[in-house]
Structure formats: C-alpha cells, structure tokens
Amino acid sequence: EIAIPYEVQVEAPYAMTSMGKIRNLFHFANLAKNYYEEAKRLFFSSDFADIFLTGNPYARAVYEGLKKSSCQDTAIEEFLVSVNKKARILLSLDRDRLEYVDFKASLGSSITITKSGWGYLAVEIEIDGEFLHIDKKKFTSEDFSGSIYQLFYTIEEDKVHIGKNMGRIYIKTPYQQFSVEILVKRNRPVLQQGRAEQKRALIQLTKQYFDFR
C-alpha cells in the first residue's frame, strides 16, 4: 500500500455579499448598516439560519419568531437588538412646551426630533386640540435627514378662540412616548375691548342711578 498524504480544508458556511464573505452576526449587522436592502434579502432567505445561527439556539428562536412579522424592517431591527448587535434607536426632542402670546393669524412651526444611531423605527403622531393641524401623522427613520426630523405643525387661526387655547402633540414609538404642550393665548380685539368697556360703564352708571334713587 502507498500512503498518499492529503489535507482537507473545511470552510464554514458564508454568504457572498457586497462586503465580501460574511459568516457571523457581527458581519451581518455591518451589512445591514451599510447595505440594508441586501441584508434584508439575506435575512429572509432560506440560507440565513444555517449560515448565521448554527449553534446559537437563542438567536435561532428569536429569528424564527420574528421572520413571520408583518413588517420586515421591524423584524430585522428587533432581531439585531435582541442578539446585542446594535443599540435600539431612541428619540429626543428640542422642547416639550410651546407658548404663543397675543396670537393673531395662522402660523406654522416645527419640533426638532433627533434619533440616536442607525436602524429602522416607526413613529406615530397624535394631536389633541382642534386648532392644531399636522399633515404627516406617520413617518419612519428613513424620513430623517441624518439624525434630524422636523415635525411641522400649523395653528389654524379660525379655530383659536379668545383666551387660552390648550393643545398637545403626542409623539409615539414602540418604546417611547413624548408629549409637547401647546398654549395659544388670543386677546380680544381692541374694538371689542372698547365696546365691552363701554357696556360695563353703562351697567355701572345704571346701577349708580338706581342706587341714588
């Protein structure tokens, strides 16, 4: 018999991507950060579990539960957060209260929303106050310019009454909720003030007349 030496090289499973060969969840997280659509296709492919989750029963259980989600973007985000490969996106606001004094006409303004980090996040807006109007009541992390989103709102003049008008804008994510208080003060028009003063003076004069009698 002749012994023929040979060497067998066994290569771990991998996925060929725009970043080259990737073999683990750390690599996959980097792919999701830099080539998100490619990472999404890979995440929902039949090969994902065999390449990235072999020997990791916890990650496999999380994956099996999330891949059936109605929102694919949320599934990927929750998976990466659950396996500690990215931080959850959190929001912060530049203010929590706005006050408008001596309001006279419709006006528009905005609230600056800042997000931390990368990934997918869905945001919902609710308003309390008939004088407030917002065009867009749902948006996602894709609508941010860098880390900033400007939430525009309008105060509608024809729905603001004399005196104090209180309203709120609620900003909600699956993990956070914010409330921005809006206070609008509208004074009585000068002409109406003059007429009101005349009426009060007439009432006072009439009262004095009857008291004198």
Regions found by a protein language model. Name each.
Residues 1-213:
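Feature for long, exposed domains in two main contexts
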